[in-house]
Amino acid sequence: WSGSMANVMEDTIKQLYNLLWFCKKVQIPFEVYAFTSNFPRSFSPEGHVNPKPLYEPKDELVSIDKYFSLMNLFTSKVRGRELEDQMFNIYRIVKSFRNYHANRVIPMGMGLSGTPLNETIVALHSILPRFQKQHKLEKVNCVILTDGEGSPLTYHKTVQRDWEDEPYMGNQYINEGCFLRNRKTGKTYQMTDNWYQFTPILLKDISDTLPNVNFIGIRVMDTRDVGRFLRMNDLDCNTEEYKEKMRYYKRTKSVAIEN
C-alpha cells in the first residue's frame, strides 16, 4: 500500500482479485493484508495519532517502525456477497489514487504510504503459523505483491550522549559487519551493505523457520526496470541466462526468477 504503487495499484488489485476468486472457487482459505505506515491504530485525547508500541525495545533487537501496520483487507471467513461488497469498496478506493479530485473518498488511514516490506516479512513469523494452525493446513502459499524493495531496517542501540545524564536508546544501521540471529532456530545470517539484499536475507530466514510455507513474490514494474531488477538478483548482464530472460520478457511481458 505504498505511494510509489499509485500508478500500478489498480493492476495489482486486479491480480489480487484473480487469486481471491480462484481460492474462493476451490475453497482455499486465505487472508489478505496490506502493509502501511499510515494507518492510525490509536489516538491521543487531543485527536492526534498516538501509535501504541509494537514491542519492548531492547539492545541489539531489530527495530520496527512504530507506525507500521498490516490492514486485514479480505478474509475467506466471510460469505460470498460480503466479500464481493468489500472488494468493490477497496476497488473504489484504488481507483481514486490516480485522480487528485477523488482523494476525498479515501477513508482515514487508507491513503498510500511508505513500503514497509521488510517489517511485513518480520510480522509473517507470527501470522503464518497462526493461519496454518487455525485452518489445520500442511502447506501454505504466501504471495507478496509489491512494486519495489523496502527500506533496510535498523537495530536498537543504547548510547550515552554527552549532553544528557541518562542513557539514550537510538537506532543503528545494519551493515555487513552485522549478523542477523534467529533466536528460535539459532541460525545466523551475515548482513550486507547493499540495501536491496536486505529483503532476500529476511526471506531466507523465514523460509528456514517455516519450511512448510512456499513464498511467491509478484513484482509489478515498468519495462525499463526489468534489466535492473535482474541484475539486482545477481544475474550478470553478459551471461546467456540474463539475455534469455530479457528475450522472454519481451515476448511475454513477464519473467520468473527461482531462488
Model-derived features: where do they sit?
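Acidic, glycine-rich A-domain
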Residues: 1-259
